[in-house]
């Protein structure tokens, strides 16, 4: 809390040690919901693929490359120009784009009758002509599909819902439309875009030209699996210069990948031998990463195939009137991310939300365990602390017994709070009242601090919630509610069988996580105690209860 520096200085001059010790009085005494680990500084987490993309962008920029955006939609004719006799094999892996045709729609007398019944009026000659004009413009492409309903609605003075119903029931041509393929494809390689871009740049940029692009590509795989996705990201670069050799690719490989911790590079001829590369220049890049050594992935040796480069063939470049040699290097972003993040499955890495398996860290589990009801006021928090202190001090006292825990003013009423156990031959509190909630081996346990559970406290994550702490906050909350209403209260806890019985709330997502892995939520035990509050005699708002 805020303090007066002048007052502190004056007190320190008179009694420095005492003033220093009283410094604790200025510290916040938070409720259970505001203590660590529930009190935290959460931060968003980037997706591993996009984090890797950003790192690649920064790495290329540091090497002096300029970022470009290449065309995503590429006509099949361009693929034939680039790949020559291999084009059909490449196009077999491409997604072709299709579109709905624009039907030629007539308006007969019977259709006008149906329209009138839907919109609830006879269309005027001007409205009929406007409707015909809009449908004709739609056929010609002058009116877009998403503008069709509002345009008709405005022309015939009808609601959007009426027009939508009209198009659905009166004009079956719209329902019967089937997509028609085009010759346009989604690029399956970044190379498809590089040829188009370079054909427009070679004559207006000084050599050497160094460009890169990290963007999405699409490949029509038969199915997706741990190593293949139909949509992936390619990190590709090109260097265009009068003098070019494969050594340029080796230098780029080392310069780029060394920024990700790779070292000791090996270069091997690629057996694929694509026709858009000069023979003998298509090279696979292998790199050693010390962080992979001994990992449970297939890269446990530390060596991994990570990239491919080659020099574009003059026969392909000539199709675009490009007169200079061009070296191209590319790597799959998802593959690099798998290596950097230790993932074994591209699907789980890219789309974790779609996978049946999921994981939570122990600290994340602890932060999903909450106290359900807490006092609202500073005085209420003080009452909860006093109840806890009383139970800790007198918890083993034989019963029947009663101890005053707190007395003072709350909401303008003077009250007294007591901890009570009226039954005979027990104690003020049951054996489990000091049990603590700990996350241990993905299980949530309410356990005592005994040698038996030493490993759980040492290796697990402590939530900072004891049974008596959670119960005391519930009691203080109910005391606040009762005092507002001008009455006393009694809060009891007996044998705890579930978390809710001790005022602990488990996030539903956490419950599903624990049960899906057949782990336990074991919060139970005999607590057996009662907290009472009563309005004091002479309270200005009412009588003693």
UniProtKB/Swiss-Prot annotation:
Q: Which UniProt keywords apply?
A: Aminoacyl-tRNA synthetase, ATP-binding, Ligase, Nucleotide-binding, Protein biosynthesis
In this chain, substrate is annotated as bound at 189-191, 234-236, 276-277, 328
Enzyme Commission numbers on file: 6.1.1.27
**A single GO molecular function term of this UniProt record:** tRNA binding
Q: Which InterPro entries match?
A: aa-tRNA-synth_II, aa-tRNA-synth_II/BPL/LPL, O-Pseryl-tRNA(Cys)_ligase, Phenylalanyl-tRNA_Synthase, SepRS_C
Q: Which residues cross the membrane?
A: none
**Family assignment from sequence similarity:** Belongs to the class-II aminoacyl-tRNA synthetase family. O-phosphoseryl-tRNA(Cys) synthetase subfamily.
Q: What is this protein called?
A: O-phosphoserine--tRNA(Cys) ligase
Gene from which the chain derives: sepS
